């Protein structure tokens, strides 16, 4: 089958995200996604908890967005944490030892801890479309160039921190709806990135709700389900 997956989503287990597990599932279904990778910043806790407890036909792929010394790296199919602050090579090696797949995420986006030229052939894939990246077109073009140069598979994810943004970028994967099968297909290049930038209005609404949450102390997501 062909799986449609957003491979880069943050939940409330990331300090800068507003996405609750309930809203993650709601918007994943609304966007027609079969699978979502939860990639919280430097923690696997939420991804494992949600994957275990979610009663949904949307497959949860446990992952992490790791802060390496040289930029951010998405690890997919993880069951244990990855140390932050290591070099790119050390981080990728640790991901591989844990049985995960290492993705060079938003390698040329501004203000995102991007890897730039630290992306290497040690990675399993490059995130060529990141729907939250700025400037979007330049980010995609530069990421496509590095993926071609390194001869690596290309994937896409939203990098969503606000539930209505989920699914603006996604990856078609030629695999059964199974986590192990999906990540193996990605590493083998049986995948196709698709998507568009998150609209400015959603980015502004995210910041409005984020700062409102900080002021009021509310921990609930303010996303409107429309």
PLM regions and their residue ranges:
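Charged catalytic cores and adjacent phosphate/nucleic-acid-binding surfaces used
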Residues: 1-11, 15-17, 21-26, 45-49, ...
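Short beta-strand/loop segments at the ligand-binding rim of alpha/beta enzyme cores
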Residues: 2, 95-103
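Aromatic-lined carbohydrate-recognition surfaces of secreted/lumenal glycan-active proteins
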Residues: 103-111
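Divalent metal-dependent hydrolysis catalytic cores, especially in the metallo-beta-lactamase
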Residues: 24-42, 101-103
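Active-site rim/loop-helix segments in enzyme catalytic domains that contact anionic ligands
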Residues: 52
């Amino acid at each position: 089958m062909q799986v449609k997956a957003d491979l880069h989503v943050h939940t409330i287990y990331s300090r800068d995200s507003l996405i609750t597990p309930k809203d993650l599932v709601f918007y994943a279904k609304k966007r027609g996604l079969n699978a979502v990778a939860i990639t919280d910043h430097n923690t696997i806790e939420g991804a494992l908890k949600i994957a275990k407890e979610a009663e949904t036909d949307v497959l949860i792929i446990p992952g992490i967005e790791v802060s390496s010394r040289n930029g951010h790296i998405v690890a997919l199919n993880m069951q244990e944490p990855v140390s932050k602050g290591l070099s790119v090579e050390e981080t990728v090696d640790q991901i591989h030892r844990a049985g995960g797949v290492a993705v060079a995420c938003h390698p040329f986006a501004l203000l995102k801890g991007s890897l730039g030229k630290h992306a290497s052939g040690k990675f399993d894939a490059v995130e060529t479309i990141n729907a939250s990246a700025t400037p979007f077109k330049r980010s995609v073009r530069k990421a496509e160039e590095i993926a071609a140069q390194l001869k690596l598979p290309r994937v896409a994810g939203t990098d969503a921190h606000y539930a209505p943004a989920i699914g603006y970028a996604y990856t078609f994967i030629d695999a059964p709806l199974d986590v192990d099968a999906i990540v193996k297909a990605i590493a083998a290049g049986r995948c196709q990135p698709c998507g568009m930038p998150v609209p400015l209005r959603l980015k502004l609404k995210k910041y409005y709700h984020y700062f409102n949450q900080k002021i009021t102390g509310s921990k609930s997501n303010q996303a409107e389900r429309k």
